[in-house]
């Protein structure tokens, strides 16, 4: 396979599964599938996964993308490329049974599933690599395409690949994709070394090209929803895959484990009713726009399954709240859009008034920041909703980054005292709680046993019917969340 010019543009770990129960479907319900992994982060996994999704979707295949871990941003790019919502598979948050169930359910009508790994192939929660991408691939009996950064290396690439092949028995690396390849001679030397010493095919090559870089900023990649350059970025990845990948061999590798036909898998998926309710029992507003885009599809589906009608609100454009029984404000980048948020005075005033009148509100990270009095970034300060008596200060480095473990220690609208929750946080801000203890009616929902939260010990500000925290929760890891929120909305 020789390099060529780009082609022209063409077309707590839960012990129950709740309404996601799939019985004994397991691997027999899986479609052809691939895990896109790498020896380390920033090797090109997202570019490869995005390019593959775009090419296969353009061929007319139903492509179901997945992302390992709790990330929101990579899935936004995969969603756009595949033309189908990406779903997260998080071994640490969900556990094996729920991950397998979620994969079977999410891919039940797909022709192929593309699973993008996280960090290095064997990186996990601890020294043993618990919950790694390799473990996920084994759970799903999925072949792995290893993306390797080939900059400034030739024969030594074989040692790197071979080490990944042998490190954990049962991990099935089925092919290699080379990234940052300088020229045809470089590619030839790399390919010969891998084929001779690793007995693996090189099924794709990405040339050294800045156009194949997806834009990023202070918290990683920029979400596709707020990035006007997403079309050329996805097109560049697609064209590189089209020009430099052996797509037929890749499809062969994906299908080597077999799997049921789409019709049979669809019937299997029919065993997974979202809801037995004939009509919604409450209306929940969801602020979803360029400023707030961090929502797991399963969270929205779980709310619907519990009986909610979802009504979407744009915090940047909508002047008024619709008629709703509760409000859900997910994460995002309010610090980037503080001017627009500040300018929408009428909506901010209505949200604050609704909270004072008892509207149930659940907010995560960016949503917490929006409910505060203000956001300060350097010498800039933006007025926010002001429902919570605290201020947000942006810093130059992560304040909380990674998994969190929480224990419910205080009264709150959703969770019983003593409950233990697992979630994720990733924020460059801190909350100034000066004077917090002197304000009546405020409480703290969570004690932090792992992670940062508000101050390393606490998370989850409670005020009236508001629960706002830095922690992001996933409905498959916290199955009681959706039903509790809908019940609170119904109760008013």
Predicted ranges, named:
Residues 154-258:
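Internal gly/pro-rich beta-alpha loop/helix module
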Residues 334-413:
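Cysteine-nucleophile active-site neighborhood
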Residues 1-29, 257-281, 438:
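Intrinsic disorder/low-complexity segments
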Residues 67-68, 202-210, 309-316:
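Beta-strand->loop->alpha-helix junctions that form or flank phosphate-binding loops
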Residues 292-302, 309, 394, 401-492:
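C-terminal and late-domain segments of enzyme folds
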Residues 27-140, 148-175, 183-188:
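ATP-dependent carboxylate-amine ligase catalytic core
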């Amino acid at each position: 396979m020789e390099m060529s010019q780009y082609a022209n543009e063409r077309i707590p770990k839960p012990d129950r599964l709740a309404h996601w129960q799939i019985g004994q479907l397991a691997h027999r319900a899986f479609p052809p599938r691939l895990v896109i992994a790498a020896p380390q982060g920033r090797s090109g996994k997202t570019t490869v996964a995005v390019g593959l999704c775009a090419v296969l979707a353009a061929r007319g295949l139903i492509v179901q993308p997945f992302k390992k871990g709790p990330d929101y941003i990579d899935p936004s790019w995969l969603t756009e490329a595949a033309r189908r919502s990406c779903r997260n598979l998080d071994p640490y948050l969900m556990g094996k049974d729920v991950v397998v169930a979620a994969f079977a359910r999410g891919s039940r009508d797909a022709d192929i599933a593309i699973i993008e790994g996280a960090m290095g192939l064997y990186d996990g929660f601890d020294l043993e690599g618990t919950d790694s991408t390799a473990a996920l691939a084994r759970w799903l009996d999925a072949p792995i395409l290893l993306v390797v950064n080939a900059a400034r290396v030739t024969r030594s690439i074989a040692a790197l690949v071979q080490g990944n092949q042998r490190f954990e028995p049962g991990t099935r690396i089925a092919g290699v994709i080379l990234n940052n390849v300088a020229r045809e001679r470089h590619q030839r030397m790399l390919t010969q070394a891998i084929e001779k010493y690793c007995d693996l095919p090189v099924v794709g090559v990405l040339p050294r090209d800045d156009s194949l870089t997806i834009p990023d900023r202070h918290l990683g990649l920029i979400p596709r929803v707020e990035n006007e350059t997403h079309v050329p970025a996805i097109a560049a990845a697609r064209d590189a895959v089209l020009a430099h990948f052996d797509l037929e061999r890749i499809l062969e590798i994906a299908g080597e484990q077999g799997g049921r036909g789409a019709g049979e898998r669809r019937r299997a998926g029919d065993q997974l009713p979202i809801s037995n309710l004939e009509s919604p029992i409450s209306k929940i507003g969801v602020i979803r726009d360029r400023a707030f885009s961090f929502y797991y599809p399963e969270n929205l589906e779980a709310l619907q399954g519990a009986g909610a009608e979802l009504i979407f609100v744009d915090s940047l454009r909508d002047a008024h709240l619709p008629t709703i029984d509760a409000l859900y404000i997910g994460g995002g980048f309010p610090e980037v859009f503080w001017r627009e948020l500040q300018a929408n005075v009428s909506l901010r005033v209505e949200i604050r008034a609704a909270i004072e009148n008892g509207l149930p509100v659940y907010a995560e990270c960016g949503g917490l920041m929006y409910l505060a009095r203000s956001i300060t970034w350097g010498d800039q300060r933006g007025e926010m909703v002001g429902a919570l008596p605290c201020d947000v200060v942006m810093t130059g480095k992560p304040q909380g980054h990674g998994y969190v473990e929480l224990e419910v220690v205080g009264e709150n609208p959703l969770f019983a005292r003593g409950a233990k929750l697992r979630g994720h946080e990733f924020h460059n801000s801190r909350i100034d709680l000066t004077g917090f203890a002197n304000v009546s009616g405020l409480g703290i929902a969570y004690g932090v046993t792992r992670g940062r939260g508000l101050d390393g010990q606490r998370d989850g500000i409670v005020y009236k019917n508001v629960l706002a925290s830095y922690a992001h929760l996933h409905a498959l890891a916290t199955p009681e969340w959706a039903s509790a929120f809908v019940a609170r909305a119904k109760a008013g």
